[in-house]
Amino acid sequence: MSMVYINIFLAFTLSFMGLLIYRSHLMSSLLCLEGMMLSLFVMMTITILINHLTLASMTPIILLVFAACEAALGLSLLVMISTTYGTDYVQNLNLLQC
């Protein structure tokens, strides 16, 4: 395994650990999710380019489309929660509260 793969895997792991540790704020969770998606995109692109997989060349672009949709929905949810409650805590997303 080359150093590039190790660094990208380390970036994914750090983003995942950040998602587990800083899950109280919605903005921190969204940033960690974006870091995970970016590292997956780079890893997938490098793997496809090195192995010359021409049939799978659209897969990273599809992943980017899903990442953009996830970012747009996450930011709209962040704006809605912050205008309604005044904070961006994830605990405000619980719909079963009175």
Swiss-Prot record:
Enzyme Commission identifier(s): 7.1.1.2
Transmembrane segments: 1-21, 30-50, 61-81
Gene label: MT-ND4L
One family name in Pfam for this protein: Oxidored_q2
Keyword Transmembrane (UniProt): yes
Membrane-related topology note: Multi-pass membrane protein
Catalyses which reaction(s): a ubiquinone + NADH + 5 H(+)(in) = a ubiquinol + NAD(+) + 4 H(+)(out)
GO CC entries: mitochondrial inner membrane; respiratory chain complex I
GO MF annotation: an example: NADH dehydrogenase (ubiquinone) activity
GO biological process, alphabetically ordered: ATP synthesis coupled electron transport
Protein name per the record: NADH-ubiquinone oxidoreductase chain 4L
Function comment: Core subunit of the mitochondrial membrane respiratory chain NADH dehydrogenase (Complex I) which catalyzes electron transfer from NADH through the respiratory chain, using ubiquinone as an electron acceptor. Part of the enzyme membrane arm which is embedded in the lipid bilayer and involved in proton translocation.
UniProt-listed InterPro entries: NADH_UbQ_OxRdtase_chain4L/K, NUOK/Mnh_C1-like
Annotated source species: Neovison vison (American mink)
Keywords per UniProt: Electron transport, Membrane, Mitochondrion, Mitochondrion inner membrane, NAD, Respiratory chain, Translocase, Transmembrane, Transmembrane helix, Transport, Ubiquinone
